[in-house]
Regions:
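Helix-loop-helix
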Residues: 165-179, 249, 253-324, 329-330, ...
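Juxtamembrane helix-loop junctions of ABC transporter transmembrane domains
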Residues: 2-9, 32-33, 40-56, 80-127, ...
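Transmembrane helix-loop-helix hairpins at lipid-water interfaces of multipass membrane proteins
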Residues: 27-90, 167-172, 283-289
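ABC-type nucleotide-binding domain
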Residues: 63, 346-623
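An intracellular "coupling" helix at the cytosolic face of ABC transporter transmembrane type-1 domains
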Residues: 119-120, 136-145, 149, 153, ...
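A short amphipathic helical element positioned immediately N-terminal to and/or at the very start
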Residues: 9-24, 130
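Hydrophobic alpha-helical transmembrane segments of ABC transporter permease domains
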Residues: 32, 87, 91, 99, ...
Length: 623
């Protein structure tokens, strides 16, 4: 392992230990139990010599043997082993509870951090790869903490205890065992080091496979429609082959470790018997049959934990690879928010001044704290303006050029243009999912960079073509737009969105449970719920991103009525593939290659006979 890799591993271990600090008293209990287990194991091995020399050998050839002493000795030996068994049981159960507690905290922290990541992260990472952090990577950590760590501690304590016992029994044999063990440890280090690199690659490959499978499951209809089954299989085979190669290399070394260690242990056992027998026959060091038997048992107790350590090293290396991926995710830079302007609930006092209130007034204002400490309230109206805005997802490649537009309170602004023209990008900038490269965007006259992102997004509503529904009831999905909404407000939002009729036809009405992203509902019904969710939030600004481009004409009419009701009195930005949905807009912006090439209302643009006219008359298709 190179220096950089060792440093990363050290940091990863420190971070794992930081999560374990909370359970230090349980760890003390675990250590005590491990000590008891190890001492009981060694004491049992040592007692075998006493049993043979003091209780069994004297009975050999005796004409009137008395077994009372032997039976008592066997009972004592049984009690010693019972203590060891109970201690092992207790520390294993305790470590399982510690492991689950640590993993819960890691998952909580990981999810909390993930919620703070910018949209860019999710745009550049597959969902399956992100999911593998919560499944494969955390599972390897669970195995390490619940099994590998206690086993390693137990093995280490057992090795120390056995070494002390062996030196007490016979110094010569003890030295031989230590020399032999050094050779075994050298072999273990070499093999574990070789497999470690590939375990890291294996975890990365698992993430890629999960990501590809997730994409294929979500896009299965598209795959079948375009008959890309074979092409998809070929792509999967390539990714799967990469996983196979990395897993093979990792486990090739890992799987030969145990057989090698086991055979070396057997060889050591035979050599101890030969050397011990030779020393006993020559009367060296007072070796007896009982001492040799004890030593043979101690050698097993010595090689077994070494084998266990070598076995657990594979799990630990894999777990550290998974933990490194998790901590890399948690080290990703979170979405920056330096805004100081907040959105507050307000009302008019007796002097018609705007004042902040805890009451639910449905009246909002931007709260700005001035340099002199005074507070300025700006009534939330939904006026959005772009001034000479440039933007690029990559700083070196600008995709929006010199965008200037004005949307006054209650105006409907529509964006039309081919795919990739920049329509959705503009709405992403209003939400501050991405920050602009140059220019200014204002909301009610305030630079949106000064507004806290949470408050900015709270004032915006969005209805997407691809509606995301969550597992839960219809009512809960609508209330997702405003968690403080009452049942009556939910019902009112559904009626406004024209969703009330179909909801009441469901088996349990508003309490009908949907799952699997609402797969049992039609596309139109899903969009009606999305409109209702936006309605219950009651935002002054609405973004309708291609909201009716994938449903039939009849359903579109129902959805359109819901959207028309939702748009009343609000500033609205519309992106649609059907020009019929934008012709009644106050302003229509025609985009091409990231630039606004035409602007005006429907009649004005038709009279200009430019790009919009060509799109509207069918000379060009609107993509």
């Amino acid at each position: 392992m190179n220096k950089h890799g060792a440093q990363n591993t050290g940091k990863t271990i420190k971070r794992i230990l930081s999560y374990m600090k909370k359970y230090k008293f349980r760890f003390i209990f675990v250590l005590i139990c491990i000590l008891l287990s190890a001492v009981a194991n060694v004491a049992g091995s040592m007692f075998i010599g006493t049993l043979i020399d003091d209780y069994i050998t004297p009975l050999l050839g005796s004409t009137n043997p008395v077994f009372t002493g032997l039976l008592k000795a066997i009972c004592v030996m049984g009690i010693v082993y019972l203590v060891g068994i109970l201690a092992t049981l207790f520390y294993n159960r305790t470590m399982v509870s510690i492991a689950q507690g640590v993993l819960k905290k890691i998952r909580d922290d990981m999810f909390t951090h993930m919620q703070k990541l910018p949209i860019k992260h999710f745009d550049t990472h597959t969902h399956g790869d992100i999911m593998s952090y919560y499944t494969n990577d955390t599972d390897t950590l669970r195995q390490m903490m619940a099994q590998s760590i206690p086993q390693m501690f137990s093995s280490a304590v057992t090795i120390i205890s056995v070494v002390v016992a062996m030196f007490i029994s016979n110094v010569y044999l003890a030295i031989f065992v230590l020399v032999f063990a050094t050779c075994m440890m050298f072999v273990t280090k070499k093999i574990a080091g070789a497999s470690g690199r590939f375990f890291v690659k294996q975890q990365q490959s698992i993430g890629k496979v999960n990501g590809y499978i997730e994409e294929m499951i979500n896009g299965q209809k598209v795959v079948k429609v375009f008959c890309h089954e074979e092409h998809s299989k070929e792509d999967f085979d390539k990714i799967n082959e990469e996983l196979c190669e990395n897993a093979t290399e990792a486990n090739k070394y890992a799987n030969i470790l145990m057989p090698i260690m086991a055979n070396l242990g057997n060889l050591q056992y035979v050599l101890i018997a030969i050397i011990g027998g030779a020393l006993a026959l020559n009367g060296v060091a007072g070796l007896t049959l009982g001492v040799i038997a004890s030593f043979l048992q101690l050698s097993k107790s010595f090689t077994m934990p070494i084998n266990q350590i070598s076995q657990q090293l594979n799990s630990i290396v894999m777990a550290l690879a998974g933990a490194e991926r998790i901590f890399n995710l948690m080290d990703e830079e979170v979405e920056q928010d330096n805004g100081d302007v907040t959105l507050v609930n307000v009302k008019y006092d007796r002097n018609d001044n705007i004042v902040e209130t805890e009451e639910k007034t449905y009246m909002w204002a931007w709260k700005e704290v001035q340099k002199d400490g005074s507070v300025k309230y700006t009534r939330l109206t939904g006026e959005v303006k772009f001034f000479d805005v440039d933007f690029g997802y990559n700083p070196e490649k600008i995709v929006l050029h010199d965008i200037t537009l004005y949307a006054d309170h209650g105006e409907k602004v529509a964006f039309v243009g081919a795919t990739g023209a920049g329509k959705t990008t503009i709405t992403n900038l209003i939400n501050r999912f991405y920050d602009i490269a140059d220019g200014t965007i204002t909301y009610d006259g305030i630079n949106i960079n000064r507004i806290k992102k949470k408050d900015l997004r709270r004032s915006l509503g969005i209805v997407l073509q691809d509606t995301n529904l969550f597992t839960g009831t219809i009512k809960e999905n609508i209330r997702y737009g405003n968690l403080d909404a009452t049942d009556e407000e939910v019902y009112a939002a559904a009626r406004l969105a024209n969703a009330d009729e179909f909801i009441n036809m469901l088996p349990d009405g508003y309490d009908t449970v949907i799952s699997g992203d609402g797969g049992s509902l039609s596309q139109g019904q899903r969009q009606l719920l999305s409109i209702a969710r936006a309605a219950v939030a009651d935002p002054p600004v609405m973004i309708l991103d291609e909201a009716t481009s994938s449903i039939d004409t009849r359903t579109e009419a129902i959805v359109q009525r819901g959207m028309d009701a939702l748009m009343t009195g609000r500033t609205v930005f519309v992106i649609a593939h059907r020009l019929s949905t934008v012709r009644n807009s106050d302003v229509i912006m025609v985009l091409e290659l990231g630039r606004i090439i035409e602007r005006g209302n429907h009649e004005q643009l038709i009279s200009q006979k430019g790009k919009y006219y060509q799109l509207y008359t069918g000379a060009f298709e609107l993509e």
